[in-house]
């Protein structure tokens, strides 16, 4: 396997996966539920939590550098093969479904430039023209990654820099237009009629999703030129993303009063740019949104393909997915991922169904590995500092699972259950020496039993 990803490429991978479409709607989303005071508290709590998680990943890359693809291997090493498989399966499934949403968003954003009241070309990203365009983009990225992860990561670095340009312009203009009196207007949100701590909770329900992707460098750590860069890249990307989110949300409240900002249609950053620089502002943000989502899609495709590949090399996924091509790209895993994305795109067009519930449930599955990162560090830590970071990361991971909805976690067993067949088949393809132990049999039984009421609740 090639080990060519340097610090800049790893940092760009993490930053690009976190900075997707959400940042462009963050001003309105936050203003609708919270005052400036609540925002400051919410960002403070979340910032501390995500930094603890980033530090946990950094520490693990230093004390267990031999564990490549941490999201899967940390869970496997710490809690057994079945837990490791479920971590990898849930992460991969979430990445596939999220990639479908990215492709839909790209062509929904393109409709800003193409659609008129008389002509609906791309619409909400689910017209046949959108599906054709999304399919073309899907396979262009597919063959790009087949040329080598390093090539794709280099292009992702350029895309990350490109997506930072409109965000940087927005921040500069917002600083120039910022008025402290506007920012302090109803500072504690009396007009919302909700206590400050309730507002804080509401902000954190939004904030918890904007750092999904923090694990990017850890996932591709096997391809890092220097293992020490993995932890550095994670920390640098988290600090950069946190800075962008803070500036975008707080400065916006100094440009437009909170009640007015809460009414701006999304992506609200476009409306603010029109306020600050005229009609061209909307075009700049629409273009920035497209570039940003394309970059995030590229990052997530790299990570989605890496997880089954690494799981297969550790005998958790069927042996075929351990194959690489001549350019050391995880070819079999990439084909699996993108064929699944293509099928989902076709189903969206054929059924016209709303897959937001499925996306929410799958997103819950990506939070479980975050908790397991903290739990693994807590399990193996020897120094008081490492134990403290592990405890903090565990608490943050549990908060993420609680805040995103325990019911969705229960429903996620519907998606875990089919994975058990993959797990059992993988053991057969690898001529696995170990039969199922008692713990694994109990866990499989619990998942199968829970999947019955969960399926009924989902379809009922």
Which residue stretches match the model-derived regions?
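TM-loop-TM module centered on a large, flexible mid-protein loop between adjacent transmembrane helices
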Residues: 72-75, 112-117, 203, 235-300, ...
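A generic transmembrane alpha-helix motif of multi-pass inner-membrane proteins
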Residues: 384-460
């Amino acid at each position: 396997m090639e080990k060519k990803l340097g610090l800049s490429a790893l940092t760009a991978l993490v930053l690009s996966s976190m900075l997707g479409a959400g940042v462009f709607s963050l001003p309105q989303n936050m203003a609708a539920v919270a005052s400036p005071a609540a925002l400051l508290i919410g960002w403070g709590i979340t910032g501390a939590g995500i930094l603890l998680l980033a530090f946990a990943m950094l520490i693990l890359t230093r004390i267990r550098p031999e564990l490549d693809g941490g999201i899967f291997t940390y869970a496997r090493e710490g809690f057994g093969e079945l837990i490791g498989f479920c971590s990898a399966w849930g992460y991969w499934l979430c990445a596939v479904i999220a990639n479908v949403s990215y492709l839909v968003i790209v062509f929904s954003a393109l409709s800003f430039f193409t659609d008129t009241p008389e002509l609906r070309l791309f619409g909400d990203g689910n017209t046949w023209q959108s599906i054709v365009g999304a399919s073309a983009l899907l396979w262009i990225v597919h063959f790009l990654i087949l040329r080598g992860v390093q090539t794709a990561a280099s292009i992702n670095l350029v895309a990350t820099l490109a997506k930072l340009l409109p965000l940087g312009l927005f921040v500069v203009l917002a600083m120039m237009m910022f008025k402290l009196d506007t920012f302090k207007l109803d500072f504690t949100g009396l007009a919302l009629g909700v206590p400050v701590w309730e507002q804080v909770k509401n902000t954190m329900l939004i904030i918890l999703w904007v750092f999904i992707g923090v694990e990017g460098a850890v996932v591709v750590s096997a391809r890092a030129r220097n293992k020490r860069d993995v932890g550095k890249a994670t920390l640098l990307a988290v600090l950069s993303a946190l800075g962008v989110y803070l500036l975008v949300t707080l400065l916006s409240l100094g440009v437009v009063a909170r009640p007015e900002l809460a009414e701006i249609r999304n992506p609200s950053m476009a409306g603010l740019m029109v306020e600050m620089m005229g009609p061209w502002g909307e075009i700049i943000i629409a273009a920035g949104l497209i570039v940003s989502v394309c970059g995030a899609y590229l990052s997530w495709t790299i990570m989605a393909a890496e997880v089954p590949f690494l799981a297969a090399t550790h005998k958790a996924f069927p042996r075929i997915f351990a194959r690489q091509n001549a350019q050391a790209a995880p070819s079999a895993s990439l084909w699996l991922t993108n064929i699944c994305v293509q099928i989902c795109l076709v189903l969206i067009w054929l059924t016209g169904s709303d897959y937001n519930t499925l996306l929410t449930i799958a997103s819950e599955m990506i939070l479980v590995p975050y908790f397991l990162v903290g739990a693994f560090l807590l399990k193996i830590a020897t120094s008081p500092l490492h134990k403290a970071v592990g405890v903090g990361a565990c608490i943050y991971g549990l908060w993420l699972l609680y805040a995103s909805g325990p019911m969705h976690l229960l429903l996620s067993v519907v998606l875990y259950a089919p994975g058990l067949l993959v797990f059992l088949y993988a053991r057969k393809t690898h001529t696995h020496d170990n039969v199922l132990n008692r713990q694994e049999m109990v866990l499989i039984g619990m998942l199968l039993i829970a999947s019955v009421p969960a399926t009924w609740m989902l379809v009922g």
